[in-house]
Regions:
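Signature of alpha-helical transmembrane segments and their immediate interfacial
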Residues: 4-53, 389, 403-452, 465, ...
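Extracytoplasmic
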Residues: 87, 154-262, 498-501, 540-623
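Juxtamembrane segments of multi-pass membrane proteins
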Residues: 66-84, 417-544
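Helix-loop junctions and hydrophobic alpha-helical segments within the transmembrane domains
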Residues: 321-348, 695-717
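Hydrophobic, glycine/alanine-rich multi-pass transmembrane helices and their short helix-loop junctions
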Residues: 255, 344-387, 391, 627-630, ...
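Short helical (or helix-break) motifs at transmembrane helix termini and adjacent helical loops
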Residues: 302-323, 343-346, 350, 385, ...
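Internal alpha-helical transmembrane segments of multipass membrane proteins
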Residues: 36, 238-271, 275-279, 348-356, ...
């Protein structure tokens, strides 16, 4: 049975615990600190970046050069979309995909020309490139439209179709090989773009309106491209964020009220993380960190979950004291002295873990790490300041309602029996946990970084359907290139032709790279015979813009373009690796020549791979740093090592689940695992902190383990149930990233709770003991349900 301390003895609090407990006696200090942070946060909302500008003026920070972006809503956040883009054939701000079996008919040609005319009449459109504007490939340079004009016969259209599928600038660039799908490349005049509808809905509606005037021509149209894809993602993200945040927070509020048996208690508990998030979003604006893509969703979720977990642990302890007959001030004094220390440790460990992101090579990841450090510290201050203020006001009387009658608290004796089962077999339980960690870790090594455009789009959306259609008909939306540059003036045009031919041969040998285009194909399409190196002079017959897009002798550059499907980095990585290696071999045979790959898929292959690996390495670094902090905080290497298993097993199990279900390792999944690590560490620290406190009161080790669960078990279970329900609400989203984030949260947090309830006590029983102590020996009778309230009273009576 649990051994309670003498009612006339004073509990042993740590110096840090006694310091935190004094906050109850000085509520004015909480008000002053809260007011100062509020003023700073408000200044960030009012004048974003003012603190960063001061640091730059003082020489303590480097100014960041922001690239110019198109004006208006459509231009926000296009930096990543436009990476690696150059003036290459097949690229446009938007791509109108048109599918019809009647393209090469008189009625079809008239309908297409009217569609183009209507689109070009829009102020927001600077021009449209489509197959009828393909440059002529004849030695005289005479204009020769692909689609016949006037009263052309069906036989002329058949000849036109055969010529089109042989035209290197048409097939695979503007027209599918079967002649049923064409693309119109739309360029926008950003000076006249005032609303996102100007480059999406209005454009598509105009095209469909023109097509409706030709009912005899079957036409299907979709709009895709860099700008529509970005706007579709932004629209879906904003809609899903608002909808599912409201649903998730509503479920959390309702479930918390049910578990706490009182809405007022939930409002007090939720006030601290809400205030912490508001403070944080203002403070990061002071340093110009608000535009980070991770800070829009990931940061508020991380802070609200970690802050809510700490608030629940604090509130459960305070209400347990109230149920034992303590006054609100005494109960809060006790909670700050015990749970407050654990909350401080969780803040330190989470902040250090997030600070490891600052070692990454990419600005977005580094800035996200510093935002997290600011956020977790600010949220902890909110928890430590708001709850004491509430306890010394009228809210303190309300908190006692329903105390001791929480829904979870009544189930603790049943869960205790499961914990006792593992404590009677601690060696077996520990061996199983360590074995599972090793096995899941080995499986997790099979994860590979991946990224696809389609993952950011709602399933079945027009942009996503157009993307799939282009993959099947034209070999993909993205146009990449092998860029050839040289510094040696002695490199002659025939030499360039040989290099281009070698590069195109490498590209054409890869089945996943579609429709390569270079000066070699253009020359082969022109009349005449002979090797390409002997016919380079024919390039002067081509329109200068076309020639310069593939070969610019003044700039000493040439390129071979090709299309890439949206199959993901995992599928394309072997292809890109082979091509890159062979291009290096070609460059090595020609001194002064460099050959490199460019394009958005190439950026995802290289840079995004490094972003994900940065996050993954930071996750591992965070685990090591958290271990070091726990060793210092608990002054015990054994407890620090013990904490590795229950904290890393959920992550390893979630990663193994990703392998078995075919999920990729992307930015969303790594961020989800990082957040879950922070929450899992919180529960572990609360348990170990309480265990150390009970040991300091002179309680036997096995009794201290069981008493620690009686004290913090309610908070651990309650926070996990609430957060899992909140995450589960997002599983119905039509966005793949949101569903993946939510599912990882559900899986990881559920496993983390099981590890903290059943693995952690067994690990402590086996490894944190003297050699002379027996293992697996429990008291003959379980602790009574009222043990925790009795213990709460004994801690303050003297």
């Amino acid at each position: 049975m649990i051994v309670a301390a003498d009612h006339h003895s004073e509990p042993v609090f740590s110096p840090t615990g006694r310091l935190f407990a004094r906050l109850v006696d000085h509520p004015w200090l909480c008000l002053v600190v809260g007011a100062l942070i509020t003023v700073l946060a408000a200044s960030g909302y009012r004048d974003p970046g003012w603190a960063l500008r001061l640091l730059e003026q003082a020489g303590l920070a480097e100014a960041k050069d922001e690239p110019a972006q198109p004006r208006g809503p459509a231009g926000r956040g296009l930096g990543r979309i436009n990476r690696g883009r150059g003036p290459a054939v097949g690229r446009g701000d938007a791509v109108l995909v048109v599918e019809s079996p009647a393209i090469f008919t008189r009625a079809g040609a008239a309908a297409l020309r009217q569609i183009v005319s209507r689109i070009e009449s829009l102020d927001s459109v600077a021009g449209v490139t489509w197959l009828d504007q393909a440059p002529p490939l004849n030695v005289f340079g005479l204009p020769e439209p692909i689609l016949p004009r006037g009263a052309a016969t069906p036989s002329r259209f058949k000849v036109a179709r055969d010529r089109a599928v042989e035209h290197p600038l048409v097939v695979g660039q503007l027209l599918s090989p079967d002649g049923r799908t064409l693309v119109m490349l739309v360029r926008f005049n950003w000076a006249y773009v005032d609303d996102e509808a100007d480059v999406t809905d209005t454009l598509l509606a105009t095209a469909r309106s023109a097509a409706a005037e030709h009912p005899a021509v079957p036409l299907e149209m979709w709009l895709t491209g860099s700008v529509p894809l970005r706007l579709e993602w932004m629209r879906s993200r904003e809609t899903n964020e608002r909808t599912f945040q409201l649903i998730a927070y509503g479920l959390i509020l309702a479930l918390s009220a049910l578990l706490f048996r009182g809405l007022s208690v939930v409002l007090v508990t939720a006030a601290a993380p809400v205030i912490g998030v508001l403070w944080t979003m203002g403070l990061i604006r002071c340093f110009g960190l608000q535009d980070n893509p991770f800070s829009h969703v990931i940061l508020p979720i991380l802070l609200s979950l970690v802050g809510f977990a700490d608030s629940v642990h604090m509130m459960v302890d305070i209400r347990r004291g109230l149920a034992a007959g303590l006054t609100p001030r005494e109960a809060c004094h006790r909670g700050l002295a015990t749970v407050g220390v654990a909350c401080f440790l969780t803040m330190i460990t989470t902040a250090i873990g997030m600070a490891s992101l600052s070692l990454a090579r990419h600005d977005a990841v580094r800035d996200f790490g510093w935002s997290c450090v600011i956020g977790v510290a600010t949220t902890w201050v909110a928890v430590m300041a708001v709850l004491p203020l509430c306890c010394v006001t009228r809210w303190g009387r309300v908190l006692a309602k329903g105390a001791g009658r929480e829904a979870i608290g009544g189930q603790l004796p049943r869960i205790q029996r499961g914990i006792d089962f593992t404590l009677r077999r601690p060696r077996v339980t520990s061996a199983v946990a360590i074995g599972l960690l090793a096995a899941c870790g080995l499986v997790a090594l099979r994860l590979q970084p991946d990224d696809r455009k389609a993952t950011i789009l709602p399933m079945g959306s027009p942009a996503q359907l157009a993307l799939d259609r282009l993959d099947k008909t034209l070999g993909g939306l993205d146009v990449c290139s092998a860029d050839i540059e040289w510094t040696d003036d002695s490199l002659t045009p025939p030499d360039v032709a040989d290099i281009v031919t070698a590069v195109e041969t490498v590209v054409a040998a890869e089945p996943l790279l579609g429709h390569p285009l270079s000066i070699r194909r253009l020359i082969d399409s022109l009349p005449g015979e002979g090797p390409v190196r002997e016919r380079m002079a024919l390039l002067d017959l081509l329109p200068p813009p076309l020639k310069q897009s593939l070969y610019d002798p003044d700039a000493r550059s040439a390129r071979v373009t090709f299309r890439v499907q949206d199959k993901g980095t995992v599928v394309y990585k072997p292809t890109f690796d082979r091509v890159d290696a062979r291009l290096r071999e070609i460059a090595a045979r020609h001194p002064g020549v460099t050959i490199g790959l460019s394009g958005e898929p190439i950026w995802r292959w290289r840079d995004l791979y490094h972003v994900v690996m940065d996050l993954a390495r930071s996750l591992g670094t965070a685990a090591i740093e958290i271990l070091a902090v726990m060793v210092v905080a608990f002054r015990s290497l054994r407890l620090g090592l013990i904490a590795i298993v229950p904290n890393m097993l959920p992550l390893a199990a979630a990663a193994a689940w990703m392998v078995f279900t075919g999920q990729p390792l992307d930015i969303v999944s790594v961020c989800a695992l990082t957040i879950c690590l922070g929450i899992a560490v919180d529960d572990t620290i609360h348990f170990l902190s309480r265990y150390r406190f009970e040991m300091a009161q002179g309680i036997p080790r096995m009794d201290a383990i069981r008493q620690a669960f009686a004290e913090v078990g309610t908070g651990m279970i309650m926070t996990t149930i609430v957060l899992v329900v909140g995450f589960s609400s997002v599983l119905i989203s039509d966005n793949r990233d949101h569903r993946a984030f939510a599912m990882l949260g559900v899986v990881t947090l559920s496993i983390a709770l099981l590890c903290d309830l059943f693995c952690l006590p067994a690990l402590v029983a086996v490894f944190d003991r003297d050699r002379s102590e027996p293992v697996g020996v429990l008291p003959t009778s379980p602790p009574p349900p009222e043990a925790a309230p009795i213990r709460a009273r004994s801690l303050v009576e003297s």
